[in-house]
Amino acid sequence: MKVSVSWLKDLVEFNNDIDELSEKLSMTGFEVESLEDLSEQAKNVVIGFVEEITPHPNAEKLKVCSVDVGLPKKLSIVCGAPNVKAGFHVLVAKVGAYLSSKSLKIKLSNLRGVESEGMICSLEELGIESSNEGIEILEENEANIPPIGSNAVDYLCLNDTIIELAITANRPDGMSMVGIAREISTITNSKLTLPNLNYIEDFNIFEPKICDKETIGVDCIYSITYIDSIDNTGKTNKNIFNKLSSLKQNCINPVVDITNYLMLEQGQPLHAFDADLLDNIIGRKVKPNDFGIRNGKQGELFVALDKKEYKINPTIKLITCDDIPIAIAGVIGGNNSSVSDKTTRIWLEAAVFTPTSIRNSSREIGLRTDASSRYEKGISSNMTTAVSKRASELISVQLGGDNISSYVNTDFKKKSISVNLRMDKINSVLGKLSSSDSNFVNNNSTKLRYLNEDEIETLLSKLGLILTSNDSGWNVQVPPYRSSDLTREIDLIEEIARLIGYDNFDSNMPDPLEPGVLSPTKLVERRLRNSFIHNGFQEVVTSSLVGPENTDDNAVLIKNPLLSETSRLRTNVWDEHLKILQRNVSFGAEGCWIFEIAKTYKKDKECFVETNLLSGALTGSKRLSKWGGASKQLSLDYFEARGKLKQSLDVLGVETIDKQLAEKDFMHPGRTSELFVEGKSIGFFGQIHPSQSEKFDLIKETYLFNLDFDSLIKAATRKTNWTRIYKDYPTVPYMERDIALIHSKKYSSLEIMGLIKKTGRPLLEKVELIDRYEGSSMPEDEISQAFRIRYRDAKKTLVEKDINPIHEKIRNALKEKIKAELRS
């Protein structure tokens, strides 16, 4: 938002210098992005008088002018403007001047054999106007001509500074000169003098054809005003022209300039349609009810004021006259109804549209205008009709407008927001004043104290709030222009702190000051992340937003997506994980092991369900090097991949049980297991289906895991698992025996290990798979495996006679239960 200091001084009486004012604005939330001194545009540009003109000896279209600029010697300047005449005052850029709009430095030059000692300028060359109608002749525009040789700054009204402010989304009132003037009045304790707005509700009710209810919401408004007998052929009022020019607004014609002027002044966009052109469009005289709002049609074309043709779709909202598009709502008007110097009758639109609808339309056509930027932040409907009436009055006074008739789509009443503000709540939130550099409090003593009621009333009244005292504090009525950000008690308290200055309040540290402690959940999560990283995994973070290729019927759709590729929330994580593996392998990585703690989202009837997952994927091999040893090549088969996951999960202190998973579309049917913790299924681990390997151009030995993170954390932080119980270190040795067997493939190694553990109690301490073989030398439905069993008695050293009965019992159980053929 660009703000003219000269314009501000018409609205508020402040005496602060520009740097001090900029500092105050920045400290109260209006960050100053840049300062521009407009007088630099007219540096070395002076008032000159053309005394004599002679033809150029070597160029038919050029003239040699003798110009008096207040120096002892007249300047000889070569000029090609057709309207240059002797006996008139002009603007002269002397040698050394820099015209920033043209990036041109004026030098002593030789033009076709004649020396030129400067340049006679047009307003376009000085960056004042966009039109190029020749040089500026002062007698045509100014009765009181400045002295010859004087600086042109005052004549050009460039004795001004432009402050560019960053306006936050919660302060749409800052998108107007009046809004910034109110802020400056408050922070500098200065008198405010604002233009009067007429809130008398004398608009007629009409029924526009609003087919799209999303554009005009409950708190929105649509009004039009008919004005005829306008003389739009002259020049714009000088005051309005100068203010628009200072803010780099193109001056078009008086009607359009008045609408732009009021948009900058009040923050309410206005748009004027040429009534005669509208009559021609629909083939009859336009009536108020002919106006409407609808969605665009796919493939519809629209030529806007910028002469560009835009392709319309149903996301874009259109203003129509008898269903014919005449504007893109809140963004830009149509070329078919544009106001020109020939316009004598207009329909003036003043409306408030929903921010979302304007944002969508603006994004779809790739155009952001001054009007759309204001609508996107939100505008109060309370001021719309009043600003429209002010525009009608200016047009009537300056351009002779007559027969004014105003219409509005609803019997709109000014809405007020009331907030209860408690004195004790202010004190408890803000604490005591430690010092004060503020205009609102006086705390010269070093003693800490709370704000008093008079100080609070003075400050809030300056903001335009109306306070009514009650037992606990005040009932505060919020003005329309602050209705978007002052809706709660805490908002008012924040406003008090913002204006007094946060650094003027005493800072209280917690007493006693205790170090922060991670909760068990966060501690386990941190340990788990570190464990995965130590085992060779890399953590990734993927986007929660996905495109329409996610065809899950339960996917949560985004109502206002920025792109079609981010139009819904993900229902799984593995799709993106497989893409990451694909990218890394395509870039030459030998292997890629990744994990992520992430959320997925689904619809469940009327509710939305978020699920916390621990997911990951592994493909290829990795080299894990250690100090003092050579790198070891790890080839990744099913059991090694599952082993890496097991090692990573061991830090949780919970046991995971694998059971074969019958079927999962994207997983290999014979190489996928369902994982259980404490008897509850928490997810799966396995090799991806060959079709997925082909789809993502990955090797077949690619593995996925997808686990319920909350269930894992719950089990890990359960008191029996979380509270570590001290166990004496064994003082007696263990004994180990191996069992090798051939058995049917229908029995998994985990089932066999479970049977061994159950049978070998109480001396069996540990069992692990140490060898596995399947191949052409064995029947297709059989497999050979070897297990190592560890026995130990905590009280004594075991001997053969202690172990033999139990070991034989295990062998018999394997023969009977799974029909195993024992090899050892």
From Swiss-Prot:
Residues 414-507 form the B5 domain. Binds 2 magnesium ions per tetramer. Its cofactor is Mg(2+). InterPro entries: aa-tRNA-synth_II/BPL/LPL, B3/B4_tRNA-bd, DNA-bd_dom_put_sf, Fdx_antiC-bd, Fdx_antiC-bd_sf, NA-bd_OB-fold, Phe-tRNA-ligase_IIc_bsu, Phe-tRNA-ligase_IIc_bsu_bact. It catalyses: tRNA(Phe) + L-phenylalanine + ATP = L-phenylalanyl-tRNA(Phe) + AMP + diphosphate + H(+). GO terms for molecular function: ATP binding; magnesium ion binding; phenylalanine-tRNA ligase activity; tRNA binding. Its main location: cytoplasm. Gene3D superfamilies: 3.30.56.10, Bira Bifunctional Protein, Domain 2, Ferrodoxin-fold anticodon-binding domain, Nucleic acid-binding proteins, Phenylalanyl-trna Synthetase, Chain B, domain 3. It is found in: Cytoplasm. It comes from the Bacteria. This is Phenylalanine--tRNA ligase beta subunit. It comes from Prochlorococcus marinus (strain NATL2A). The lineage of its organism: Bacteria, Bacillati, Cyanobacteriota, Cyanophyceae, Synechococcales.
